[in-house]
């Protein structure tokens, strides 16, 4: 088993061929982190890694002459009230007002496989041989409370997962005010922190900062989602780490609500990383025999740079986070009508768009917002999940049947968590809104948040949308969510339980997803939240793809998809070819570039094909054929490599290489044209050095060995004035091994 407990030294060694994680029981019964990094050989005793010295102002937590001080110890799960003045992973308020806790080792269990987390998404195993898990039980004798720290290490991935569970065994009521899922301490601060930040239409831009003494953090307080502003992910990399070399530690949170990812550097240059539910607005009371389970943190170690980290996340999330029929399954090429029609459509217009989609080879037609209630604009209709017969006199069932008769699958847009005040749902249940009755209810996009912390609300929405699905032939659902939670108050909860509202809301979303995916296992779900405001691992557990951003401009998507690839696999990224001028930026980019960007995702169209010229239609047909030929490689079978960063210059490049290194597809993108430009070579990655390849691009062909293509590279074509290419030029390369 790749987890060993050495009794004499009281040390746990969690390891596989990639990494080692070592923790031990200290003399005061608490847990210390000794090492996390590249795999090292197991042995009985690693106690030399414990560092202890007399320092000024230290609070010693063992009898004299001991020198153990929590302030200067790399703790496994730091708590408040034992002489550590850094931020704790756990804060518990007791009946007497005290927040002092002291959890000491009681027992542990090592077992094969991985347990499910009740009510929460998490990575999983399909056999006990795939992973080994460790539960360490600690106990606070004053509160009579157990703290269970859970670790799982996969056999074939450089991954350790972490979570924590509190179990109240005593009679007093305790209140959890801060419960992190994981904490990790490093002995130095020589790292740079990477995070993915942005806003609506520019999600997950790559940001890097050097660690400094003090606290640096990213977080979400959006309530309904992990947010566009910050993604629930951070990484620590060494300063000289590149895409392909050097150490990096990734931390990804399998959760879709408020989160905190925090890095604190002490005055002695120790680095503490913590990740979990954001304590702001969170409070959870536990009575006797009640427990609280935190979401999971997925930690990746790579000594092969940022690409190595990303590929580990991609493989794990593709293989052991996504589930069901669509796991490791290429996606259908779709056309969505939103940017073609917005709310202004009827059955005839929809059928005309669908007919043209079928002619070019599209496989799935998706009807977006506007099909239900009185939904003629975004002021009304949300919450009323019944068909607007004025637009669709034959209903969704009639429309879906006609679409299927064309030879297309049919998909539908929904926004199940929201309500307009101008709706039957609100008029019947005004108390179902999130918000305090004595406060103004802020609106966003003219809508309000339904209280999914209440089971009766989830039941109502489940029954409403299930009826629509049952009566129709639906193969795909796009589940949108277009606002944050501004006044987090539940009219269905007591004063003591208001701190549970935001977490229970997310649990309600997960409950509805669970019920719908179990009842309709063949439907492909795509999550969406004003674009990418809820692009997180928690969503991928239920919906194996996410609408990456509402910004469909090809040039902007280069940055968005590049950043998203740090954690999320290509097959999870919703990516469409849209009309020009682009509806978000009014920018015009070539049709070829729009496709060359969208290929590296789920691929589809978001425009009215009837408005294209005959030449453009032929180009679209060729694009569809290309994607059908290469989508297994791009979406399922290949490893993704970042080559040139759009955040560092005018050029972007990336590629996907098959696991056997026999096939690859690469994309190169130049943002703005340059006159009399310098020479440039594009160097591929991930190929077999000794394999002869045939490379095709545009009207050119080259035969070269893998080492040539990776180290010498291919010259990027330019002419003196570069009149041919223009702005936003791109090149697609196909690479095939020669026998």
Where does each model-flagged region fall?
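Conserved, mostly hydrophobic/aromatic
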Residues: 18, 164, 289, 335, ...
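Polysaccharide-binding surfaces and accessory modules of carbohydrate-active proteins
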Residues: 5, 9-13, 17, 31-264, ...
